Regions:
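Cleavable N-terminal export/targeting peptides
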Residues: 1-28
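Amphipathic alpha-helical scaffolding segments
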Residues: 52-54, 149-153, 165-170, 254-256, ...
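Residues on the lipid-exposed face of transmembrane beta-strands in outer-membrane beta-barrel proteins
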Residues: 128-134, 148-150, 233-241, 253-257, ...
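Extracellular/periplasm-exposed beta-strand and loop segments of Gram-negative cell-envelope proteins
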Residues: 46-48, 99-123, 155-230, 260-290, ...
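Predominantly the C-terminal beta-signal and adjacent terminal strand-loop region
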Residues: 290-293, 298-348
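Short loop/turn motifs that connect adjacent beta-strands in outer-membrane beta-barrel proteins
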Residues: 22-29, 122, 133-146, 157-159, ...
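Transmembrane beta-strands of outer-membrane beta-barrel pores
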Residues: 35-41, 150-156, 255-263, 315-319, ...
Length: 348
């Protein structure tokens, strides 16, 4: 009888010990599915637009096309052999008469206008992430392991904000007789001399010329759009600290890989300050494989033995994707992306 009692006690003790060990031994695998929201992803369009003849050119009273953005100078009926002409015109005497140098100033934008549109933000898009975590070793409150994830996010960035275009502007100075005053002119009511005249005379060739690079030449209006899908994976070591009975803090970092698929389009019109419009439209598609790194922190709430709520934030650097499509260069900045995640996990 005594032997039976001792055997029963030993078996009971072993069962309790085994049960306690199983309870203390956490589940080593966890899979989770989370919503993943990106922040701090930006895109920008840049490029150039050729400044040629306006689609609807301005003309003189005699039908000649303006040879400056803000006026014209041509030889008059006499042939201007004396170096003077009354066949000229301008838009604004307040800004185009240089009284100190007895000159009429006429200007034109030449070459290409450089375009740099405002940044577009990709905040608030919705994606997902499927993650697998494996504990490898550790103590009762701290565990070390690794994670592998698959994630996706779709981005749609667009803008119709206007901006200034810069280019090369040439300003030519035409002399008039000292002591005389050119006819008045104002925007919308410019002065226009005729081929046959008579009228106020100025020199038919400039006595000086100034070229300025990178000066604002007009305003760009229209729209720009970039649709991008980003498939990715993260692989790296993990650290988990069980700081409370049902809660733990996780830290991780490592390799990030992304496959980005881009569709870009634009429809823009450049309106020169001195008149004339130029329109440019286009589109393009491309994809690229990006390599980078990430760092992440999260919190796990184990509301049952196997089920948990997982949430956190991730910093990811996949560099800057850049591609030219015709007259535009598109840049998608993935170098400082922030992702916020929230989902549910299952341990086994």
């Amino acid at each position: 009888m005594k032997l039976h009692f001792l055997l029963l006690a030993a078996l009971t003790g072993a069962a309790v010990t085994a049960s306690t060990a199983r309870a203390a031994d956490p589940e080593r695998n966890r899979v989770s599915l989370s919503l993943r929201v990106p922040f701090n992803i930006q895109a920008r369009f840049s490029g150039a637009m050729t400044i040629g003849a306006p689609a609807v050119p301005r003309t003189t009273p005699n039908g000649a096309t303006y040879n400056y953005d803000d006026g014209y100078v041509f030889n008059d009926v006499s042939g201007s052999g004396d170096g003077l002409t009354w066949y000229w015109g301008y838009d604004d005497s307040a800004s185009q008469v240089d009284g100190a140098n007895n000159a009429v100033l006429l200007s034109r934008a030449t070459g290409n206008a450089s375009l740099s549109a405002p940044d577009m933000d990709g905040n608030g898009a919705l994606g997902f992430e499927l993650a697998y975590n494996r504990d490898l070793f550790g103590g009762e409150t701290t565990r070390f392991g690794f994670e592998a994830t698959l994630n996706y996010v779709g981005l749609s960035l667009d803008s119709s904000a206007s901006y200034r275009a810069c280019g090369t502007r040439v300003v030519d100075s035409f002399a008039f007789t000292p002591g005389t005053t050119p006819p008045g002119a104002s925007p919308g009511s410019g002065y226009q001399g005729t081929f046959n005249g008579p009228g106020f005379v100025i020199g038919n060739t400039p006595f000086s010329s100034t070229t300025t690079l990178g000066t604002p030449v007009g305003t760009v209006t229209g729209s720009r759009n970039l649709d991008a899908t980003l498939w990715g994976t993260r692989i790296g070591p993990t650290f988990e600290w069980h700081f409370a009975e049902k809660f733990s803090l996780t830290l991780s970092g490592g390799l990030a890989i992304g496959l980005v698929d881009v569709d870009a389009s634009w429809n823009e019109t450049l309106t020169l300050d001195a008149g004339g419009t130029f329109t440019d439209t286009g589109s393009g598609s491309d994809n690229d494989l990006r390599l980078g790194f990430y760092a992440a922190a999260g919190v796990v709430w184990n509301f049952t033995e196997r089920w948990s709520v997982v949430g956190g934030a991730q910093y990811q650097n996949l560099g800057k994707y850049t591609q030219s499509f015709g007259s535009r260069t598109v840049e998608l900045d993935l170098s400082k992306s922030i992702f916020v995640t929230l989902g549910i996990g299952y341990s086994f």
